[in-house]
Amino acid sequence: MIKAIEGIITKKEPTNVWIKTLSGVSYGISISLFTSASLQKGEKVELFITQVIREDANLLYGFIKESEQRIFEMLLKVNGIGASTAMAVCSSLGPDEFSIAVMNGDDAVLRRVPGIGPKTARTLIAQLSDAKFGEINSMPSYQNEAFMALESLGFKRDRISKVLNECSSNDTASLIKEALKKLA
């Protein structure tokens, strides 16, 4: 199974890239819009790869961040979610936004993704609510600590996330103080 590909981008479209490796083999790889935004034709890159083997095709999905790849792979395990819907989620929501929406049960955020209606959003929340997003979440550790402290004080997750994004402190104690002022 292919887990990563390193090479030069020879062709780039919004959701696809062609990477030529040192051995001369070129791979066509589907990518999210977030990954696409950070890639340029002609540059050397390494993408984390998820390989999906179907009866009629062998598909490669590439991600610049491992956290985005983990979200994609989690989504593939949800009943009724295929690779194209999982890629639509990765193109519409960043790993942090997705994990917070699932943890908060916020189906409105999930319904913004093309191809996800109310029923699919509820299914995603139900099946992923116990998922371990801590390793996916890319917030710095001081923000995670502040998040957990504020949550233990009874504040709602969505409100905490919004306030923490507005704060400028770079250590746990200062961040909690700043957030409490805004939450009050």
Swiss-Prot record:
Name of the protein: Holliday junction branch migration complex subunit RuvA
Domain description: Has three domains with a flexible linker between the domains II and III and assumes an 'L' shape. Domain III is highly mobile and contacts RuvB.
Endpoints of the signal sequence: none
Annotated function: The RuvA-RuvB-RuvC complex processes Holliday junction (HJ) DNA during genetic recombination and DNA repair, while the RuvA-RuvB complex plays an important role in the rescue of blocked DNA replication forks via replication fork reversal (RFR). RuvA specifically binds to HJ cruciform DNA, conferring on it an open structure. The RuvB hexamer acts as an ATP-dependent pump, pulling dsDNA into and through the RuvAB complex. HJ branch migration allows RuvC to scan DNA until it finds its consensus sequence, where it cleaves and resolves the cruciform DNA.
Region of interest (Domain I), ranges: 1-64
Keywords: Cytoplasm, DNA damage, DNA recombination, DNA repair, DNA-binding
Region named Domain II: 65-137
Location of the region described as Domain III in the Swiss-Prot/TrEMBL record: 138-184
Family affiliation: Belongs to the RuvA family.
Residue span of region Flexible linker: 137
Pfam families listed in its UniProt record: HHH_5, RuvA_C, RuvA_N
Disulfide bond as UniProt keyword: no
Sample GO molecular function, one term: ATP binding
Matches recorded under InterPro entries: DNA_helicase_Holl-junc_RuvA_I, Hlx-hairpin-Hlx_DNA-bd_motif, NA-bd_OB-fold, RuvA, RuvA_2-like, RuvA_C, RuvA_C_sf
An annotated GO BP: DNA repair
